Swiss-Prot record:
Quaternary structure, from the entry: Core subunit of respiratory chain NADH dehydrogenase (Complex I) which is composed of 45 different subunits.
Single annotated GO MF: NADH dehydrogenase (ubiquinone) activity
Domain of life: Eukaryota
GO biological process terms held by the UniProt record: ATP synthesis coupled electron transport
Membrane topology: Multi-pass membrane protein
Keywords from the named record: Electron transport, Membrane, Mitochondrion, Mitochondrion inner membrane, NAD, Respiratory chain, Translocase, Transmembrane, Transmembrane helix, Transport, Ubiquinone
EC number annotated for this UniProt entry: 7.1.1.2
Transmembrane segments: 1-21, 29-49, 61-81
Coiled coil: none
Reactions this protein catalyses: a ubiquinone + NADH + 5 H(+)(in) = a ubiquinol + NAD(+) + 4 H(+)(out)
Main localization of the protein described in the UniProt heading: mitochondrion
Species this protein is from: Otaria byronia (South American sea lion)
Name this protein carries in UniProt: NADH-ubiquinone oxidoreductase chain 4L
């Protein structure tokens, strides 16, 4: 495994550990999810370019589209929760159930 792949894998791991440790605030959880998606995008793009997978060249762009949709939904949920309750604690999300 080259150092570039190792660094990208470490970025994913640090984001995952951050997601597991700092899950009380919604904003920190969203930032960790974005870090994971960004490292997956870079890893997928580099793997496709290095191995010459021409049929899978659209996969990183599709992943980036899903990451953008996830970020938009997460930020809209963050705005709604912070306007309603004044904080961005994840415990407030249980109050949104019908």
């Amino acid at each position: 495994m080259s150092m570039v792949y190792f660094n990208i894998f470490m970025a994913f791991t640090v984001s995952l550990v951050g997601l597991l440790m700092y899950r009380s605030h919604l904003m920190s959880s969203l930032l960790c999810l974005e870090g994971m998606m960004l490292s997956l995008f870079v890893l997928m793009s580099m793997t496709i370019l290095n191995n010459h997978f021409t049929l899978a060249s659209m996969a990183p762009i599709i992943l980036l589209v899903f990451a953008a949709c996830e970020a938009a939904l997460g930020l809209s949920l963050l705005v709604m929760v912070s306007n309603t309750y004044g904080t961005d604690y994840v415990q407030n999300l249980n109050l949104l159930q019908c």
